[in-house]
Amino acid sequence: MTNIRKSHPLAKIINESFIDLPAPSNISAWWNFGSLLGICLIIQILTGLFLAMHYTSDTMTAFSSVTHICRDVNYGWIIRYMHANGASMFFICLFMHVGRGLYYGSYTFTETWNIGILLMFTVMATAFMGYVLPWGQMSFWGATVITNLLSAIPYIGTSLVEWIWGGFSVDKATLTRFFAFHFILPFIISALAAVHLLFLHETGSNNPSGVMSNSDKIPFHPYYTTKDILGLLILILMLMLLVLFSPDLLGDPDNYIPANPLNTPPHIKPEWYFLFAYAILRSIPNKLGGVLALVLSILILAIIPLLHTSKQRSMMFRPLSQCLFWLLVADLLTLTWIGGQPVEHPFITIGQLASILYFSIFLILMPISGIIENRLLKW
């Protein structure tokens, strides 16, 4: 009798994806973030589902329904803060995952990489809409500022913004539709993640050395399942430390003030994970130019496979490219800091320089370093 794990149609899919999957024998902890993102998505869907049972998407009651969840619902406070801080953990894992892909040349799997970029856009859209739902000051003004950016699109901009708003300002219709989209998008993300995995399993995983590992594979279970469980424990520990000791550390105090269209907060800023893109947006004085730079700050990832000039896939043995990679990390941290600062001197200049450096690293410096390293190999 054949093992049910290998014969049953459903069990066979799970077996080939998580149990008998041939995996490279040398993949490091940087390969843990894919599974951690899956765990984050499950946590977000479950906590979000329970929050949706008590939340009301109406401008009059949204803020008080969130207060009600925290005060009156059994363990509502922990569900709410796990959801809010779970989003932060999600983005930490996402940035690490993308950084790993950049460092080790995983972007040469173009289909997997491009679906990953699509996933990133979808996750960012979901997080943005989720931030609007508590209907605090920063929720309302964040929604107003970010949706207003679409008015920079020539000819159709203004109509498009009013169509998204469902009126002439961010109001009840906007909140209701944002809640509907915020609810459905995680399931679309799940489907995209399955396609992401499907394409990944067509080629097999990359590994730190960047060379083919077909001659040296090990089964995913028990080796990498055990390793992933360790990653999961660390993730849960970090999330619960955040939730139980400083749940509002990454939030904005302005969001504890109910939304008021007549009173603008002194500094409108998005959640921390969007600050780098927000800084790039603000560094360009022209509205349309800023919006284009904002979109390109993520979309630039799509052309990275075309700009790969090195004969080696991974940066493991490429010191010049390694320096540029860590310069990029430092630049992103600088942009994140600038995004949270007021628009005044010297922050404007620092933001503009950091934005120029961000695009220069991808478009000019990385390809040049690849060519130089190829030359050095001939010596």
Curated annotation (Swiss-Prot):
Manner of cofactor binding, per the entry note: Binds 2 heme b groups non-covalently.
Residues engaged in binding heme b b562: 83, 182
Cellular compartment(s): Mitochondrion inner membrane
Keyword field: Electron transport, Heme, Iron, Membrane, Metal-binding, Mitochondrion, Mitochondrion inner membrane, Respiratory chain, Transmembrane, Transmembrane helix, Transport, Ubiquinone
Alphabetical list of Pfam families matching this protein: Cytochrom_B_C, Cytochrome_B
Residues binding heme b b566, per UniProt: 97, 196
Membrane topology: Multi-pass membrane protein
Cellular-component GO terms for this entry: mitochondrial inner membrane; respiratory chain complex III
Cofactor section: heme b
MF terms (GO), sorted A to Z: metal ion binding; ubiquinol-cytochrome-c reductase activity
Residue stretches spanning the membrane: 33-53, 77-98, 113-133, 178-198, 226-246, 288-308, 320-340, 347-367
Quaternary structure (record): The cytochrome bc1 complex contains 11 subunits: 3 respiratory subunits (MT-CYB, CYC1 and UQCRFS1), 2 core proteins (UQCRC1 and UQCRC2) and 6 low-molecular weight proteins (UQCRH/QCR6, UQCRB/QCR7, UQCRQ/QCR8, UQCR10/QCR9, UQCR11/QCR10 and a cleavage product of UQCRFS1). This cytochrome bc1 complex then forms a dimer.
PANTHER family (alphabetical): CYTOCHROME B (PTHR19271:SF16)
Note: Heme 1 (or BL or b562) is low-potential and absorbs at about 562 nm, and heme 2 (or BH or b566) is high-potential and absorbs at about 566 nm.
Full protein name: Cytochrome b
Organism: Poiana richardsonii
